[in-house]
């Protein structure tokens, strides 16, 4: 029996591939028989098309859930490409955490799994009163998937992120590594093994580099190739019960 459950997708930094991983994870779970829905509560850096604001990250979501409108994946759309608290201030908008939480629960009622994507890393402010994404994660108390980029510096960034979550007693589902460019496989493997030893955290999978990720996400065969080696057993433990 599938549990109705949310997962929080966070990253070690901005531009590490959270949206790519969230999109892939959506289809990965759907392939496992789980009705998964990607959701980014606050989208900053939205573009405008006439009077309509277009969320760039949600456009990627729509490639894997094309039956939904691009505006269905966010609660707040903000134009400035900066931290949500500042983008909201610049737009004279107040971000209401209770509205976001209510939206999460409504989505949970409609889907088996809701994949909640944060912005930047753990300590990016969500509101200007000092409430950060890690505070929101603590409030939701759902399993967290950490996206880490396979690049120089990833050991420090990943270990610090894991330690910050452990300090808050947040449930950690595991780490997904995203290859942003073709790198040295010896260095990449060493980084992964070092992180595994230092954090004792499950490695859920890897996303190999793709020069045209939008084309890949829109194609079933190409998309499945990116997550073919993900840890299905671990995910089954997280989303199923007797």
From Swiss-Prot:
What reaction(s) does this enzyme catalyze?
(7R,8S)-7,8-diammoniononanoate + CO2 + ATP = (4R,5S)-dethiobiotin + ADP + phosphate + 3 H(+)
Where, by residue number, is the active site?
40
> Which GO terms of the cellular component aspect does the record hold?
cytosol
Organism listed in the record:
Halalkalibacterium halodurans (strain ATCC BAA-125 / DSM 18197 / FERM 7344 / JCM 9153 / C-125)
Assign the protein's first listed, main location to one coarse class: cytoplasm
**Where is the protein localized?**
Cytoplasm
Family to which this protein belongs:
Belongs to the dethiobiotin synthetase family.
Q: What does this protein do?
A: Catalyzes a mechanistically unusual reaction, the ATP-dependent insertion of CO2 between the N7 and N8 nitrogen atoms of 7,8-diaminopelargonic acid (DAPA, also called 7,8-diammoniononanoate) to form a ureido ring.
Quaternary structure (record):
Homodimer.
Recorded hits in HAMAP family, A to Z, give: BioD
Has UniProt tagged this entry with the keyword Ligase?
yes
| Name of the featured protein | ATP-dependent dethiobiotin synthetase BioD
What gene name is given for the protein in this entry?
Answer: bioD
Q: Which coenzyme or cofactor does it need? A: Mg(2+)
- For this protein, what is the EC number? 6.3.3.3
Q: Which UniProt keywords apply?
A: ATP-binding, Biotin biosynthesis, Cytoplasm, Ligase, Magnesium, Metal-binding, Nucleotide-binding
Q: Which residues bind ATP?
A: 15-20, 117-120, 178-179, 208-210
* Listed pathway(s): Cofactor biosynthesis; biotin biosynthesis; biotin from 7,8-diaminononanoate: step 1/2
GO BP terms in the entry: biotin biosynthetic process
What residues bind Mg(2+), as annotated? Answer: 19, 117
GO MF terms here are: ATP binding; dethiobiotin synthase activity; magnesium ion binding
The record lists substrate as bound by 44
């Amino acid at each position: 029996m599938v549990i109705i459950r949310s997962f929080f997708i966070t990253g070690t930094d901005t531009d590490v591939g959270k949206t790519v991983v969230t999109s892939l994870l959506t289809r990965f779970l759907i392939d496992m028989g789980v009705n998964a829905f990607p959701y980014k509560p606050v989208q900053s850096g939205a573009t405008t098309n006439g009077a309509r604001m277009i969320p760039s990250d949600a456009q990627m979501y729509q490639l894997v859930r094309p039956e939904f409108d691009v505006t269905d994946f966010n609660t707040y759309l903000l134009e400035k490409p900066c931290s949500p608290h500042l983008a909201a201030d610049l737009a004279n908008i107040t971000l209401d955490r209770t509205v976001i939480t209510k939206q999460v629960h409504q989505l949970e009622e409609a889907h088996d799994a809701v994949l909640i994507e944060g912005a930047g890393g753990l300590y990016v402010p969500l509101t200007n009163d000092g409430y950060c994404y890690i505070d929101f994660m603590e409030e939701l108390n759902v399993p967290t998937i950490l996206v880490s980029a396979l690049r120089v510096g990833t050991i420090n960034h990943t270990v610090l992120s894991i330690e910050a979550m452990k300090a808050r007693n947040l449930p950690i589902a595991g780490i997904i590594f995203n290859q942003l460019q073709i790198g040295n496989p010896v260095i990449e493997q060493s980084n992964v093994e070092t992180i595994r030893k230092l954090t004792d955290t499950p490695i859920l999978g890897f996303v190999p580099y793709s020069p045209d990720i939008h084309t890949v996400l829109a194609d079933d065969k190409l998309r499945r190739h990116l997550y073919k080696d993900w840890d299905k057993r671990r995910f089954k433990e997280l989303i199923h019960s007797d």
